Amino acid sequence: MRNIDINNRGLGAPGVASQGVSHHITLENLYIHGVGDSQQTVGIAANSAPTWNWTIRNNQIIGAGTGMYLGNSDGNAPFVAGLIEHNLIRDTIGYSMQIKHQTVWSSVPAGMPTGTTTTVVRHNVFSKLSSFVSADGARPNLLVGDQPPSGPGSGNGFEIYGNFFWQNPTEALFQGEGNIAFHHNLMVNASGPAVVIQRHYGSVRNVRIFANTIVARDNGISVTGGQSGTTQRVAGNAVFAANPVSISGADAAQIDNVTGSQAAAATYLNNPGAALGQLDLYPRVGQLQAPALNTSGLSAYADWNRDFNGTGDSWTTRGAYAGTGTNPGWQPQLAIKP
């Protein structure tokens, strides 16, 4: 499905919804609006049955109740091996996007991959700057849930990178559990926390949070509740918040992050406190420089060595960018990232 203007005129129906098992679906260049009559109204929904190999690309979802709702609240409609890239999701009441947790797969439809797969979320813009502020809308911009605790799909995971997270008046920008690689993202939240890794309906498993640039009022990166036998690592980030990095657990560790208060971001970044249009999270000349980060194990992840702009990362600059001075790439804004 491509190149369609979808306006539901506030009548309570989703913009796009799958019915039954579906796979190898592409949704591209859609403009979805008029789906904001309540938090329960969704821009793109895949929550009725197992779905796999969906591509959701270059779409705009404006003012929805929930931008994307992938999987179901009971964990029995797994969303598997998806690619979600270059979308703009803004001004939702609830989540910009949620990928639900999964219970043990009671049955596997023909053709559904049972080996290890990854859902990739990259180069999207998630903004709740103008979201309606109420208890009903207190949701993160992006939330991802755990994989099945055992059996097929239990080794699956998420790779989330190159995204721009902008503001949330009531919640964190990102909340996750399961197996997660989270890298080279830009995050600004003047009203609350940025990254929260904690148990939701499943478990916190192997988590890698590296090379992100974060400016937030409260917690920058918080990691708790790691499952026994798994590891959580926070490395090479530039985090400016009241509590920049907080981790707990015997197998959780942080290393080689540059941290400071929210106000200190102005010492390291070109213009971190500005409004969109002037916002510039690129490092000032000579700032955030450090010896090369130990990247052992990171090459398993897609584009692990590409910064927010897609430039090769030499790992001597902390945060989401690989250089200092003048940003040669896309300036963060509420538009589809090229």
Give each language-model segment a name.
Residues N3-D5, G12-G15, S38-A45, G67-Y69, ...:
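Structural detector of coil-to-beta-strand junctions
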Residues A252-Q254, A263, L269-P338:
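Surface beta-loop-beta hairpin patches that serve as ligand-binding interfaces in beta-rich domains
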Residues D74:
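Surface loop/turn signatures of beta-propeller and other carbohydrate-active proteins
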Residues R2-N3, Q19-G36, T51-G65, P78-Q98, ...:
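Right-handed parallel beta-helix
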Residues I6, A46, L70, I99, ...:
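Extracellular beta-strand solenoids
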Residues G153, Y201-G202, L298-A300:
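Short, small/polar residue-rich loop motifs at catalytic or cofactor-binding pockets
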Residues E171, V196-S203, S222-S228:
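Short, contiguous acidic/charged loop-to-helix segments that flank catalytic cores in large enzymes
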Residues M1-I25, N29-Q39, A77, M97, ...:
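Extracellular polysaccharide-degrading/modifying enzymes targeting complex plant/algal/animal polysaccharides
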